[in-house]
Amino acid sequence: MRAPFSPFRAADPAPPGTGLVVIPTGRARSNHAEVARSLGTAIIAGRFAAGAKLPGDGDLLATYRVSRPVLRESVKTLVAKGLLTTKARVGTVVRERAAWNMFDADVLAWHLEAGIDRRFLRDLAEIRLAVEPAAAALAAERRTPDDLAALEAGLARMRAAPSDSEGFSEGDLALHVAVAVASGNPFMRSIGGVIEVALRASFQLSAPVEPAERETTLAAHARIVAAIAARDPAAAAAAITEVIHNGLRRHGAAA
């Protein structure tokens, strides 16, 4: 009797020897979202190569124990995110990585669950370096009192929390998101998902942060807030660039 199809699941450890680090996201999901997550994570983890055909509906239905409409909705979700394509007389096929929507929040989260490596972190840092300094410069020019209050709140949360705590990382994330919001550019804000994944991955890989490193991190983030408060675009861009490079250095992904 044929064994049922069983994709690589995000809850499992990354395969040995891959150099990947799995970071659980702990997100609640509906049935169709859970199936999409499991299949999406399996694709990202390399369980299905580009050009490979997915198992038939019968195998997938037996594996996930969901209705056919739920399965179809899950596949549609993955098609919309660029991971799959449907071909007449062929079936459902995995697309090349270049076609994946890497700005999609689910696709980014599935990368964390599948297991990330240093190259992935460098890729994230490169897009951050292309966007965040510009966002910080715009924030220095356009910030409102409410924007400044949000920046200061994020920094205060970091200062109040131990460096290996969720509060520290959430404060860090809140500060960076506040920079994007303060830029006044909706496209800058939309990249928040990339920033969130980068920060969560960096924090997981580098935690616990040593006390001396904690002070360095706090001081660097304080310079971002101070530059935006002073309406100094060049200083704000330089400060956030320093923070991104420091993060790369901490987890060993610097070029």
Identify the residue ranges that each predicted region occupies.
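Cytosolic histidine kinase catalytic core of two-component systems
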Residues: 146, 186-187
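Transmembrane helix irregularities
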Residues: 182-183
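C-terminal all-alpha effector/ligand-binding and dimerization domain
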Residues: 2-17, 27, 155, 159-160, ...
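Flexible, glycine- and charge-enriched loops at secondary-structure boundaries
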Residues: 25, 32, 144, 165, ...
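Generic alpha-helical secondary structure signal
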Residues: 34, 38, 130, 150-153, ...
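Short linear motifs at protein or domain termini
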Residues: 1-130, 137, 255
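All-alpha effector-binding/dimerization core of bacterial HTH-type transcriptional repressors
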Residues: 4-9, 99-178, 216-239
